[in-house]
């Protein structure tokens, strides 16, 4: 660098300017290159006609890989590896129970549980793991202020425990709230931030794959089975570790059911009932093995509607159904109790 400065100082143009009293030239000649500031050095180079070496710059190119994951728990997931879902879904319709003896209903919190997560359960078929970052159960009343009765919500973080059947057992739960039927109430469930595997089968260990169990209790109403409100589940869940899509249809050969639980079958003699676990649109196909093996299916419940196309010769029935609430039933009557049936349920 000193050689460069000496060359510029000995430049005839700089020497001439120094003799004429130019301050920059005088400073360079008398005090040296190191005494100049950066801007003064640039001006001196221009005066001496000095051309700096040409530097080659490699242009920056955009990365074509996944971005690093964000640390915020509510931030979007890493592209191609995880997905964050924040939503509020209808969990259940709350019905009143008369007397002081409460009735109980419960749901296991697992992303593929259609009864708890009607929409998320479909997305969860593409992932192996999940992490819950926020979870709240909301009770929304749909009754008058004169309605008697109590509604209680509880949560057990161990889904393998037996659901409570008494008030004492319910209030032993680690987290619970209670309210009058005409008053809204939220149950904010604490989360642990753990990443769990998504349940694949009923044989999986509930302690490892399920987040917990939500419990609803009602009692003290003047009338039974009257709608008093609705339950909603509000959540933020991160799905991770993409995998091949799991089964999205439920099929049965009359005894064994495979796939997600859209309906719960029950058999009583020659009668088969398929109870739908959630509100939604469904296509149910029922097929027998002999002509006239079953009669035309019927719809049971105040919240179910749809069309049933039935052909006795084959026999086969195609049912396109809409359920406004859980618990609605499609009833099939067989000509004999031993007559096998096959049925498949699709989500529409």
Swiss-Prot record:
Segments carrying the region annotation (Disordered) are 59-86
Superkingdom, natural source = Viruses
Q: Which intervals of the chain are annotated as region P domain, projecting?
A: 240-348
Region of interest (S domain, virion shell), residue spans: 82-239
- Molecular-function GO terms, alphabetical: RNA binding; structural molecule activity
Q: Which cofactors are named for this entry?
A: Ca(2+)
Task: Report the function annotation for this chain.
Answer: Capsid protein self-assembles to form an icosahedral capsid with a T=3 symmetry, about 32-35 nm in diameter, and consisting of 180 capsid proteins. Also acts as a suppressor of RNA-mediated gene silencing, also known as post-transcriptional gene silencing (PTGS), a mechanism of plant viral defense that limits the accumulation of viral RNAs.
- Official protein name in the record: Capsid protein
Species of origin reads Carnation mottle virus
Q: What is the lineage of its organism?
A: Viruses, Riboviria, Orthornavirae, Kitrinoviricota, Tolucaviricetes
């Amino acid at each position: 660098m000193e050689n460069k400065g000496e060359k510029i100082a000995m430049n005839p143009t700089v020497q001439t300017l120094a003799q004429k009293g130019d301050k920059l030239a005088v400073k360079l000649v008398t005090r040296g290159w190191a005494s100049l500031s950066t801007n003064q050095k640039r001006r001196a180079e221009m005066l001496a006609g000095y051309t700096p070496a040409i530097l080659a710059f490699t242009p920056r190119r955009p990365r074509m890989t996944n971005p690093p994951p964000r640390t915020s728990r509510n931030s979007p997931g890493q592209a191609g590896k995880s997905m964050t879902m924040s939503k509020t879904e209808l969990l259940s319709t709350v019905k009143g129970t008369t007397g002081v003896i409460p009735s109980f209903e419960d749901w296991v919190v697992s992303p593929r549980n259609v009864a708890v997560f009607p929409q998320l359960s479909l997305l969860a078929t593409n992932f192996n793991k999940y992490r819950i970052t926020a979870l709240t159960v909301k009770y929304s009343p749909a009754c008058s202020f004169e309605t008697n009765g109590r509604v209680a919500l509880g949560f057990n973080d161990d889904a393998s425990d037996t659901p409570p059947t008494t008030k004492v057992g319910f209030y032993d739960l680690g987290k619970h709230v209670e309210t009058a039927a005409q008053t809204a109430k939220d149950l904010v469930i604490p989360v642990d931030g753990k990443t769990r595997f998504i349940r694949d089968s009923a044989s999986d260990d509930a302690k490892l794959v399920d987040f917990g169990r939500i419990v609803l209790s009602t009692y003290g109403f003047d009338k039974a089975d009257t709608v008093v409100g609705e339950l909603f589940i509000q959540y933020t869940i991160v799905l991770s570790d993409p995998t091949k899509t799991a089964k999205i249809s439920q099929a049965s050969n009359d005894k064994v059911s495979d796939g997600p639980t859209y309906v719960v079958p029950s058999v009583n003699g020659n009668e088969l009932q398929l109870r739908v676990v959630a509100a939604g649109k469904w296509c149910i196909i029922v097929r027998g093995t002999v002509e006239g093996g079953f009669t035309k299916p019927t719809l049971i419940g105040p919240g179910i509607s749809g069309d049933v196309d039935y052909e006795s010769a084959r026999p086969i029935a195609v049912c396109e159904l809409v359920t406004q609430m859980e618990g609605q039933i499609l009833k099939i009557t067989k000509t004999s109790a031993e007559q096998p049936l096959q049925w498949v349920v699709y989500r529409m």
